């Protein structure tokens, strides 16, 4: 409200500005040490727990959303809005919990950052692979297909950083696991409906509701594309329409009376179910989002930025011997690679993209600066030298 919004939107560009501000802030932050950067994957994992409680609470008890929203924004607004429109008992849709996927991804990345694949068969590391599977299960339990896709890309990027082209060997294993899950569904097991929705793109005897809702989501995205190029793109093709929108538009999703009024206004509009998402700068389609907000000019710069992100992160790990790759390198490439690919293929939201990408690339940049100064650092006092973590092949005592 201090920023002028009357609903849950209206000033999305403020979040973008905050995300972008991490570039100069983290780049110039004093006192950031080598060992601090190696703790980032652990901090990321611990931070993923923050959203769990409020999102679970507001998913299963949607009426608590307005109360939680007063102090924290990590609530399931979609479930609250669906309840206002009559989704009692969940008969209108499958409840999805994105915080579970965030936790699962962070768990998998923490394992891969601190425990390289070549050590997994050691007796004290046999728990790592089950934890990676658990991370994938949490992504599936979230109900979001794009998180399954991104988790797979994150695992591949992390393994590429430590075992290079041997990481391609995981592809047959992943395909076999997918076929096994599909073959057992409906015959030996009935997986939770959210898992079935997330995995419905694979062959299998999936629940009709899960398949239907997933297909409807795909069709919905196609309508987003059609409407954007039909009615919105030509309005500002070069520079886009900006990030600001009328904040009163978002009120229809959280106010029962306004929702009914909006439904009457939408009568006869074949794009009524997708129009508000474009107008509120939340089209769920990456290419549409960047063209809508910044136009062709901004899209050219954005694509160049994305290519630079991938080149910089992969170059960092490629020029480092596999046994010497550090946790911050693994974490950075595992964050950047899936989110860039997913933005252009399965799901794209510019705000969420920048919130994750800007800190990740800046922390990797700080690491590279420190690495360049390592000879000078190692020439310092023995106390300073002993403060550096051991190479990846010899983990510190706390993780060995």
Report each predicted region and the residues it spans:
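Hydrophobic, aromatic-rich transmembrane alpha-helices
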Residues: 105-120, 297-320
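Alpha-helical transmembrane segments of multi-pass inner-membrane proteins
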Residues: 16-25, 38-82, 86-162, 360, ...
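A membrane-periplasm/extracellular boundary helix in multi-pass inner-membrane enzymes
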Residues: 59-66, 142, 159-214, 230-235, ...
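Long extracytoplasmic/lumenal interhelical loops at the membrane interface
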Residues: 211-226, 230, 234-294, 316-319
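Membrane-interface anchor segments at the N-terminal boundary of transmembrane helices
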Residues: 90-102, 282-306
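Transmembrane signal-anchor hairpin modules in multi-pass inner-membrane enzymes, especially those
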Residues: 1-8, 28-45, 67-69, 113-129, ...
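Loop-to-helix entry and N-terminal half of a specific, functionally important transmembrane alpha helix
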Residues: 126-135, 281-285, 289-293, 305-306, ...
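Transmembrane alpha-helices of multi-pass inner-membrane enzymes
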Residues: 152-156, 168, 302-312, 328-392
């Amino acid at each position: 409200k201090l920023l002028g919004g009357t609903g849950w939107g209206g000033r999305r560009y403020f979040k973008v500005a905050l995300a972008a501000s991490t570039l100069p802030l983290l780049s110039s932050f004093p006192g950031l040490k080598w060992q601090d950067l190696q703790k980032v994957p652990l901090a990321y994992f611990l931070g993923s727990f923050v959203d769990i409680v409020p999102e679970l609470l507001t998913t299963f008890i949607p009426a608590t959303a307005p109360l939680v929203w007063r102090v924290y924004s990590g609530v399931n607004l979609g479930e609250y809005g669906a309840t206002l429109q009559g989704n009692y008992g969940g008969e209108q849709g499958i409840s999805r919990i994105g915080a579970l996927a965030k936790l699962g991804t962070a768990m998998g990345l923490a394992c891969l950052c601190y425990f390289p694949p070549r050590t997994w068969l050691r007796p004290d590391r046999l728990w790592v692979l089950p934890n990676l599977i658990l991370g994938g299960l949490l992504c599936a339990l979230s109900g979001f297909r794009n998180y399954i896709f991104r988790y797979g890309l994150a695992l591949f990027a992390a393994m590429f950083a430590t075992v290079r082209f041997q990481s391609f060997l995981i592809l047959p294993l992943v395909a076999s696991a997918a076929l096994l899950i599909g073959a057992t569904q409906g015959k030996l097991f009935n997986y939770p409906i959210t898992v079935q929705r997330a995995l419905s793109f694979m062959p299998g005897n999936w629940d009709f509701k899960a398949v239907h809702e997933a297909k409807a989501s795909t069709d919905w995205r196609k309508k987003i594309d059609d409407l954007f190029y039909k009615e919105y793109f030509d309005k500002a093709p070069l520079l886009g329409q900006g990030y600001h929108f009328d904040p009163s538009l978002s009120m229809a999703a959280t106010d029962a009376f306004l929702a009914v009024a909006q439904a009457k206004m939408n009568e006869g509009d074949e794009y009524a179910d997708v129009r508000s998402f474009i107008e509120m700068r939340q089209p769920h389609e990456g290419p549409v989002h960047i063209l809508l907000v910044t136009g062709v000019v901004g899209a050219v710069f954005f694509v160049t930025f994305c290519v630079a992100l991938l080149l910089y992160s992969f170059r960092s790990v490629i020029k480092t011997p596999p046994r010497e790759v550090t946790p911050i390198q693994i974490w950075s490439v595992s964050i950047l690679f899936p989110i860039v690919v997913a933005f252009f293929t399965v799901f794209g939201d510019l705000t969420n993209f920048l919130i994750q990408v800007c800190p990740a690339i800046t922390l990797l940049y700080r690491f590279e600066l420190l690495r360049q100064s390592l000879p000078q650092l190692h020439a310092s006092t023995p106390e300073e030298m002993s403060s550096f973590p051991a190479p990846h092949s010899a983990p510190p005592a706390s993780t060995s």
